[in-house]
Structure formats: structure tokens, C-alpha cells
């Protein structure tokens, strides 16, 4: 029962307490997605921040060529960043650039890191930044030391050279920078081995220059190395001459430094300091040679150079006077150690004087060398002390030297120490010079190997003399080759090598004097000529004999009524001058105008511009008159007089022609006031005087006749002349000069006839006379009869055709065209163009059973206007002469 009660109570209990079931709340898987996204975002953020790198600020003076999100930052050719922003500073004076640097490169962002802009740059010093032409401007840097930094100030220009591993950095100390610039090359044995890196003023107020030597050449820099400046062009003018030193173009523009190093010196350490000398001479590197020198004011210590075989090997380092001896000096030479083998017991040191030499223009170093030492190598033991000898002593002391004396009225610019040349090759030297009241004497030494070039007829000419003359023919100079103009000396002229060498020779001023045998410098006239008017000659004009130069004009002196012309005939040709010599002025050109064309025979240009005189020996008596031309000179005494009423076409110098040959010319034209006429004097060639000067000769002026029909006398278009028809009478010297228009020569002897007509129509003088279309004559002139009702046409028929004119011959006007209209139709005939323009006359003889006799000269015929209708049936038979 008890158990029953307990179970019921429990049951009641549980019935009274109803169980409430509650479910546990859990996070939904959906909320994992935002969490995952957040994690991924955080990772990406940190990745972006990491890849973004370090942000830095660079300040530039200007932003030229810098573009945001485009301009790169490079280091050793690789991109390590990019520009993100570009903006002005607060004062608008500079530009700030914000850039991102890649994380792997952030370690180089230090306090002394340098940034600069790279862009293409072209200058005389070179071309830089070529890679920026393709990719555009970029920013580069040079790593530095110090603390980390993110703000920088850009450099105006980056360093040209950068110190890399193995390169040698050294420092040069100098009083001034000179013409050296950053980036200038450093040379060793003419080979570029480094660059100028930077320069500054150090604490001692000296210029300190940083030099980077490439690692491949660092071993050549020794502790005892010496550096000197080879920048630009170094020139020094002194009594010893002009010392000119020109390096490469790069050294001239940008500057350069060179150095040398002793082979046995230890290698230089990093950051070693060296003195930078102004030049090689100041560096004083070399072997010392003691010398005793002949006294000379042109020697300067530190400047006078030492040469061997035209190569500079040293310099005069010291120079001092010798007590109580003014003739010598003591000094020492610094010689290139590589040339020590030149100085042996039998070597010689010669003091030479290299004067200005235009032949060395291509080598500026030789142009103004001045006085210098020349080392002639010899054999024997090494020697370090020498007595210097002069250049002339070297040749005089040589065995078998030929010594000559040259005499001249003055020195002609030749002086002691100058060379003697043969075919531009040095064969000797002027060793001494003396002056007395008679002139100048030179002692010349000819080297033994060339003494065979000197003979009895050898001539010596001053090569120093630079003979300049200015005249109508321009600037004329006479001298030796260009390199001898200022170098000076004596030239040797050898002809055929006749005879042995003499002890003494004259020294000629120039080649012309040598050729003509002129030994003096003052010329005296050989002969004096007289002329009424001054022709086209001047002082210095040539005198010719058969076109060969034999002299020249010394002077022209005006007198009251004439001019005196002083002439000098060269001594070699004075035998050509005789009592029968006659002189005339040489024409500049001979012009011949003919139907064949214009022939011009010109003299050489110098004669044309300056004039010349010619002479021959065909005269008579002692005639010293200078004639205007050759014709005048040869025609003196052979004169005729021509009289005319009009001088329109007459001129002085007009030629007289016979059968196309010039036989004389008009000498003068004068007006005869009393007789009211013109009188002309004509000079006749003596060879034709007996033919021309005869009674019955006709003289006619030939000038061009221009008409519609053409141009007659075309040969006189440029130069009218006088035509001569010779006579058969006695000798006569006065003639009338005809002014009428001449007929052509083929009709001059034609048979004359007279044609009568009412009107001349289109006829003119010179119109052709035609027979069957062939020209057989011409119209000579027109005139009216006494009543004035008819025109008389005078014609001339060529002699060989005069038999065609018969007693019954008919003449008609052939105007060039004929038109007729009839039952049979229209007939139109034309002639030549000349007939159309100039007109013409045709003739024919009617056909009859008996041929009429030949017409007599001057017979009159009727000139018909129209062509006879029956003319086509005429002339069917031959007419006998």
C-alpha cells in the first residue's frame, strides 16, 4: 500500500509539474561569410599596403617632363617606383613630386640619397639620356648613407660618373679648376681610363677634384703618379716662338686630365690625394741632361722644347748665365725617360730656330715652334752632359761640305740660319751674313751629298722674298712654294749643269730677275720712247719682241706736248735692239667681222688688262716714236687722202678692204671748213700701196642696208668698212669717198640698161632682175626724166647673162603674185617671199623667126606693169652669145 501511495504521490507530483522544453540557440552558418570576407579584405589590404611600398616626396626646381602615373623612378636601369602626384609648393617656386618606391628598394632611401631627372641632352660635351627618348623622362637616384628619409631635394644634374665596386676614387688638388667640368675624361697614355666625378673648395681654399678610375685601369695609378691638365688649347707666345698645344675635341670642349706613373712605384690607395699640374711641363717628369748652350735671348726655361726626329721628348728645365762669359749659358733638360737611349757619347744636341712655316698649317704644333733643341742620336756610352752647337756649325763641321759666297745689293729677306733649297728639298744652309758698302755677302754651306748639283751656270734666288705687285691685272705675287713664303731661304736653279762650281754667285731677288739676268735692285732705262697720246699702257707693262717678253716699262713721264716712256730691256735680250727698231702698242684683241662670223684673237689676260709694247727691226732710221698699233707703225709714210661730203658712217680706225683683205685703216678725220667737206687720212700697208694708190681707184663706204626685202652687206653689220676697186692709172694719193649704198659685188661690173615706167610701184634699189625665175641682175637706182612724167629704172645684168637681153626683149614687174580670171578659170601664180617684200623685174624675148641682135649697154626698154599673155610661148629656142 505504501508503495502504491508513493507511486501515486509521484504521479501527482509530476502531473502537477508539466515539463517545458527549451531549444538551445546556435550561430547560423550564414554569418561565416562576412567574417571570411573581412579576413580576405584584411589580407588584401595588408598586401596592397606592402606592394605599394614607401611614399616619398621629392622637390624639383621645375616639373618639366614629369607626369603623374607615368614618370618612372629607376635605379641601375630597373623601375623601382613611379610618380603618383605632381603639384606646386606653397610659394609656387618649386614642384613637389609624390612617388611610391617598391618595398624591395626602400632600403636605399637614406638621408644622403640623391635624386635627379634624366632627359635627353645634346651638347658639345656629348649626348646623354638617349634611353629617355623612347620611354620618356625618368627619375634616377644614387644611394647614400645616413638615417632613413622620405623627403628629398632633387639635384639639378646628376653625377656623370658613379663609383662602382672595384673603381678607384682619388682626389686631385689644384689652385683653380681651369676648364675642367664634371664628366671630363682622365687619360693614361692617350687612353680614357676614368671620369671627373665632382669638385669642391676644401678647407685650405684649394680646388679638390674627385676622380673615378675604372676598375680595369685602377692598377695604373701609383703613389708617385703625376696628373696634369690637358684641357682646351694651350698657347704661349715668347721670343722662342709660339708654343701651341691642341688636344682632342672632347678635351677642348669639356676639359681633360692626363697622368703618368713610374713602373716601379706601388699602387695608389683609395681616396689618395695628388697635385694637379697645369701642364706636362709643370709636372717636370723626366731624366735630367746638363747642357752648355750658345747665348740666345729666345730660350725660356719651362717653355723651350727638346725634339728628336720631329717628336717632342723633353723641355728646357733650367737656364742660368755663366759668370764672366756672355757667349754661353748653362742649363738642364728634362727628357722623357723612354728616350734615354738617345743620349750617347757621339750624340749631338743642336740649337735650331723653327721660324713661321706656312707649310705646317696642317700640323698646328709645328706652325709656331720657335727656337728648340734637336737631338741627333749617336753611338757610344750613355752620357748626361753635352755642349749644344748651333745649326750652322753642324753643317760647316761636316766633311766635304761645299762653301759658297752669294752677293746681292740687299739681303732680300735672307738671313743667317735659313736653308738652301733645290726642288723644295733642303740641301744646305746660310751660315753667315756680312754687310759692307757694296752690298750684302752670304756664306752658304751645301751638304756634301748635294754638291754635285752646283755648277758654273747655277743660279741662286731669294726664296724668302715675297714680291707683291698690284696693278690692272690684280694682285700678283712671286715667291717660292707657300711653305717658303715665311720660312725663307735661298732657292737653287740648275739648268744643264755646265762647268764646275764657282766660289761666288750673285743672289737674285726673284725668278724673273734670274731668268733675265737682273742682278741689281735699281733699273735704269735702256731706251726712251715718245708718244703724242697716252695709250693703254702703264708702269710695269711688258715689252715684247715677236710676242716674247724681253723687257718692261719703267715709267711714263708727261711732257708739254707728248709723253716719255722709259723702257728697260733685259740684259739677255738687249742685242735685239737696233737703230731700225720700231715700237707700237700691242692691241688687247684683234677682231675680224665677216660673213663667216666673228673672229676674236685675244692676247693673254695680263697683257689685255695692263697693256704691252711690241717692236721689230723693220723700220728705217733711229725712230723712237711709240705708235698706237702695229698698222700705224708699219704704215708710216704710206698715206692716202679720202674726201667725202658726209662722215656719218666714217670713223677713226675703220678698215680699208680690197677683195676682202684688210689693206689699211683710217688714221684721222678732219673737217675742211673752207671747202665744206670731210678729209680722212688712211694708212696703207706698204705691201699694197703700189696696188691701191692708182688713178681710177674707187673707194666706197660699206654699211648694212636694211629693207623689207632683207639685209644687204651683212658683213658690215658690226663693223662698217671701206671697199676698194683698184684703178689702172698713174700713182695717186687723193681720192673721193663714195657714200652711195653699194651693190653686191657680183653686179658691180654688170651691163647697164634703162627701163622706163610710169610708176616705180613696189620696186626698190637692189630688187632682183629675173630670167625664168633665176636672178641675173639687180636694180641699181631710180631717177625721173627731165619732164618728170616717167621713172627711169637703171638696172645691171651680170656679164655672163647680158646676151639674154635682145633688141626686142620685154620687161615687166614681177610683184611676186599674179591672179587672172577668165572663161578657162582662175589662175594664181606666186613668186618668192623676197619678191613679195622687195619686188622684182622679169624679162623674156618674144619668139620670132630671126633672133634679134643683142641689146647695147644703156639701151632703153619699156617696163610693163603686167606680164604679157604670150610669154609662155617665148624663148623656146636657145640664144647664142
UniProtKB/Swiss-Prot annotation:
Keyword Transmembrane: yes
Annotated GO biological process: membrane organization
Domain of life: Bacteria
Any one cellular-component term (Gene Ontology): plasma membrane
Keywords assigned: Cell inner membrane, Cell membrane, Membrane, Transmembrane, Transmembrane helix
Localization annotation: Cell inner membrane
Membrane topology (UniProt): Single-pass membrane protein
Transmembrane segments: 30-49
Keyword DNA damage among UniProt keywords: no
InterPro entries for this protein: Mce/MlaD (IPR003399), PqiA-PqiB_transport (IPR051800)
Pfam families attached to this UniProt entry: MlaD
Family: Belongs to the PqiB family.
This protein's name: Probable intermembrane transport protein HI_1672
Natural source organism: Haemophilus influenzae (strain ATCC 51907 / DSM 11121 / KW20 / Rd)
Amino acid at each position: 500500500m505504501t508503495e502504491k501511495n508513493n507511486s501515486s504521490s509521484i504521479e501527482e507530483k509530476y502531473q502537477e509539474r508539466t515539463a517545458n522544453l527549451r531549444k538551445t540557440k546556435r550561430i547560423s552558418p550564414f554569418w561565416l561569410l562576412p567574417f571570411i570576407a573581412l579576413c580576405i579584405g584584411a589580407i588584401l589590404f595588408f598586401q596592397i599596403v606592402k606592394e605599394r611600398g614607401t611614399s616619398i616626396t621629392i622637390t624639383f626646381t621645375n616639373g618639366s617632363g614629369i607626369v603623374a602615373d607615368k614618370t618612372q623612378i629607376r635605379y641601375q636601369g630597373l623601375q623601382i617606383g613611379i610618380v603618383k602626384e605632381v603639384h606646386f609648393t606653397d610659394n609656387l617656386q618649386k614642384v613637389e613630386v609624390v612617388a611610391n618606391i617598391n618595398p624591395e628598394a626602400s632600403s636605399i632611401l637614406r638621408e644622403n640619397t640623391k635624386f635627379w631627372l634624366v632627359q635627353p641632352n645634346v651638347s658639345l660635351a656629348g649626348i646623354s639620356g638617349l634611353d629617355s627618348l623612347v620611354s620618356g623622362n625618368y627619375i634616377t637616384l644614387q644611394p647614400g648613407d645616413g638615417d632613413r628619409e622620405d623627403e628629398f631635394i632633387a639635384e639639378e644634374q646628376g653625377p656623370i660618373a658613379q663609383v662602382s665596386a672595384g673603381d678607384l676614387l682619388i682626389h686631385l688638388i689644384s689652385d683653380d679648376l681651369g676648364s675642367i667640368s664634371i664628366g671630363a675624361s682622365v687619360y693614361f697614355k692617350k687612353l680614357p681610363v676614368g671620369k671627373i666625378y665632382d669638385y669642391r673648395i676644401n678647407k685650405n681654399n684649394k680646388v679638390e677634384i674627385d676622380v673615378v678610375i675604372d676598375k680595369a685601369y685602377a692598377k695604373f695609378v701609383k703613389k708617385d703618379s703625376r696628373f696634369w691638365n690637358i684641357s682646351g688649347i694651350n698657347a704661349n707666345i715668347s721670343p722662342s716662338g709660339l708654343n701651341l698645344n691642341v688636344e682632342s675635341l672632347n678635351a677642348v670642349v669639356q676639359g681633360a686630365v692626363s697622368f703618368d706613373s713610374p713602373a716601379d712605384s706601388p699602387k695608389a690607395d683609395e681616396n689618395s690625394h695628388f697635385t694637379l699640374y697645369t701642364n706636362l711641363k709643370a709636372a717636370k717628369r723626366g731624366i735630367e741632361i746638363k747642357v752648355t748652350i750658345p747665348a740666345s735671348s729666345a730660350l725660356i726655361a719651362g717653355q723651350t722644347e727638346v725634339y728628336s726626329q720631329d717628336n717632342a721628348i723633353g723641355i728646357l728645365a733650367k737656364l742660368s748665365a755663366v759668370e764672366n762669359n756672355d757667349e754661353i749659358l748653362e742649363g738642364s733638360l728634362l727628357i722623357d725617360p723612354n728616350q734615354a737611349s738617345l743620349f750617347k757619347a757621339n750624340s749631338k744636341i743642336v740649337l735650331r730656330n723653327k721660324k713661321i712655316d706656312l707649310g705646317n698649317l696642317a700640323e698646328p704644333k709645328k706652325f709656331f715652334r720657335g727656337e728648340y733643341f734637336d737631338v741627333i742620336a749617336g753611338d757610344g756610352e750613355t752620357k748626361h752632359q753635352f755642349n749644344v752647337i748651333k745649326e750652322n756649325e753642324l753643317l760647316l763641321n761636316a766633311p766635304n761640305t761645299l762653301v759658297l759666297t752669294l752677293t746681292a745689293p740687299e739681303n732680300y729677306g735672307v738671313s743667317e740660319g735659313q736653308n738652301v733649297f733645290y726642288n723644295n728639298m733642303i740641301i744646305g744652309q746660310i751660315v753667315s751674313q756680312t754687310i759692307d758698302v757694296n752690298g750684302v755677302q752670304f756664306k752658304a754651306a751645301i751638304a756634301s751629298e748635294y754638291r754635285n748639283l752646283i755648277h758654273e751656270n747655277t743660279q741662286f734666288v731669294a726664296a724668302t722674298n715675297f714680291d707683291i705687285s698690284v696693278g690692272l691685272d690684280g694682285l700678283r705675287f712671286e715667291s717660292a712654294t707657300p711653305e717658303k713664303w715665311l720660312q725663307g731661304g735661298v732657292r737653287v736653279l740648275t739648268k744643264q749643269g755646265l762647268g764646275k762650281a764657282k766660289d761666288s754667285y750673285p743672289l737674285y731677288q726673284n725668278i724673273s730677275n734670274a731668268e733675265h739676268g737682273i742682278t741689281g735692285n735699281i733699273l735704269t732705262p735702256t731706251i726712251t720712247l715718245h708718244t703724242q697720246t697716252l695709250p693703254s699702257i702703264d708702269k710695269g707693262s711688258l715689252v715684247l719682241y715677236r710676242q716674247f717678253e724681253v723687257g718692261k716699262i719703267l715709267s711714263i713721264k708727261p711732257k708739254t706736248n707728248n709723253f716719255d716712256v722709259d723702257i728697260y730691256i733685259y740684259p739677255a735680250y738687249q742685242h735685239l735692239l737696233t737703230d731700225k727698231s720700231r715700237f707700237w702698242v700691242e692691241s688687247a684683241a684683234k677682231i675680224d667681222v665677216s660673213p663667216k662670223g666673228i673672229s676674236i684673237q685675244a692676247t693673254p689676260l695680263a697683257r689685255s688688262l695692263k697693256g704691252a709694247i711690241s717692236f721689230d727691226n723693220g723700220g728705217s732710221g733711229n725712230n723712237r716714236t711709240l705708235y698706237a698699233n702695229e698698222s700705224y707703225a708699219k704704215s708710216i709714210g704710206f698715206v692716202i687722202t679720202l674726201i667725202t661730203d658726209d662722215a656719218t658712217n666714217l670713223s677713226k680706225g675703220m678698215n680699208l678692204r680690197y677683195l676682202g683683205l684688210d689693206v689699211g685703216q683710217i688714221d684721222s678725220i678732219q673737217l675742211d671748213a673752207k671747202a665744206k667737206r670731210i678729209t680722212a687720212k688712211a694708212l696703207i700697208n706698204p705691201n699694197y700701196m703700189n696696188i691701191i694708190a692708182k688713178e681710177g681707184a674707187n673707194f666706197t663706204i660699206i654699211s648694212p642696208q636694211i629693207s623689207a626685202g632683207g639685209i644687204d652687206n651683212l658683213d658690215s653689220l658690226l663693223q662698217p668698212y671701206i671697199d676698194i676697186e683698184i684703178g689702172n692709172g698713174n700713182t695717186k694719193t687723193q681720192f673721193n669717198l663714195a657714200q652711195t649704198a653699194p651693190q653686191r659685188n657680183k653686179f658691180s661690173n654688170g651691163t647697164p640698161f634703162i627701163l622706163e615706167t610710169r610708176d616705180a610701184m613696189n620696186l626698190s634699189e637692189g630688187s632682183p632682175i629675173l630670167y625664168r625665175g633665176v636672178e641675173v641682175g639687180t636694180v641699181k637706182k631710180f631717177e625721173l626724166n627731165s619732164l618728170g612724167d616717167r621713172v627711169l629704172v637703171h638696172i645691171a645684168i651680170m656679164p655672163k647673162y647680158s646676151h639674154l637681153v635682145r633688141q626686142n626683149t620685154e620687161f615687166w614687174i614681177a610683184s611676186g603674185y599674179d591672179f587672172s580670171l577668165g572663161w578657162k578659170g582662175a589662175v594664181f601664180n606666186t613668186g618668192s617671199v623676197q619678191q613679195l617684200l622687195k619686188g622684182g623685174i622679169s624679162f623674156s624675148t618674144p619668139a620670132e623667126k630671126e633672133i634679134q641682135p643683142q641689146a647695147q649697154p644703156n639701151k632703153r626698154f619699156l617696163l610693163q606693169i603686167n606680164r604679157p599673155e604670150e610669154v609662155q610661148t617665148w624663148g623656146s629656142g636657145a640664144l647664142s652669145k
